[in-house]
Amino acid sequence: MSTYAIIKTGGKQVKVEVGQAIYVEKIDAEAGAEITFNEVVLVGGDKTVVGTPVVEGATVVGTVEKQGKQKKVVTFKYKPKKGSHRKQGHRQPYTKVVINAIKA
């Protein structure tokens, strides 16, 4: 059974495995930089360890592959018969990380 972990990053929990590429909320790091996730909630595999609230001494190491922005989301507000409308767009920034190791 392959080892996996659940980490907390950007206010969300993400299940990761070694070699997997994940998209997370923007992290201030250059492409190619190595980052460490210290908030590991669960480590699974042959023996599952659940943290209370985090697993002590467990870390997940990854490499930043690229920074980017998601597709544009457009919001449009409109009031009938008043000639009032507002169009606004938003592109959420993200970081693509490739998981290198899970240390439990």
Swiss-Prot record:
Gene Ontology cellular component list: cytoplasm; ribonucleoprotein complex; ribosome
Transmembrane segments: none
Domain of life: Bacteria
Entry keywords, A to Z: Ribonucleoprotein, Ribosomal protein, RNA-binding, rRNA-binding
GO molecular function, one term: structural constituent of ribosome
Homology family: Belongs to the bacterial ribosomal protein bL21 family.
Subunit details: Part of the 50S ribosomal subunit. Contacts protein L20.
HAMAP family: Ribosomal_bL21 (MF_01363)
Protein name: Large ribosomal subunit protein bL21
Organism the protein comes from: Streptococcus equi subsp. zooepidemicus (strain MGCS10565)
